[in-house]
């Protein structure tokens, strides 16, 4: 078999400069990938006070220890929520990826309620939709840890509202295809957050914590001011 040997001069000025530039970009990527986690974990005292795990803690306990978790759409929404690179939150309010639960490869979605109470942004919706597509294409069980304030009313758009129907329709398609859709309801979930468990094949609700309602008093006040 022919051997293709590299002729790169790892001591050259060009190589060293490009290597330094690439490492700088890798560090920037790692910082962006970890930004959402950092912001969410800043709310940990609030979760502790409520007797709850943080979204990442709950995800870690769900997944098989030592097995890989491949995140999907880590950079979704970067510089879309805001043009300020220092304030934009890559990944938005959703954690999505492929991991193993009891030895079974699954698509797992987590509402990151440490960021904007887990409300669904446009970018978060795209990330969730992509996870649903992968679940259908690859025939992987769809598992959703639900705690969401519903749609992002502070940045409401008609386009975002109309595209939201695809998220719920996809759950029906998964169920029709015989792919299990499982929701773990572990906090308050309003409006769209209530649709997710409502359209699931199996729902596990945490006693005293899991609540789902289409429009509770806080949502009505936020939407109408009354």
Regions found by a protein language model. Give the residues of each.
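Intrinsically disordered, low-complexity segments enriched in small/flexible residues
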Residues: 2-106, 112, 117
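Short alpha-helical segments and helix-capping/turn motifs at coil-helix boundaries
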Residues: 91-95, 127-130, 167, 189
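A short, small-residue-rich loop immediately preceding and capping a beta-strand
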Residues: 106-109, 117-120, 140-145, 178-189
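A structural preference for short, pocket-lining loop segments at secondary-structure junctions
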Residues: 95, 99-112, 127-154
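Conserved catalytic cores of soluble enzyme domains
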Residues: 146-226
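Short glycine-rich loop/turn motifs
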Residues: 92-96, 105, 140-141, 168-171, ...
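Flexible beta-alpha connector loops of hexameric P-loop NTPases
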Residues: 114-123, 155-161
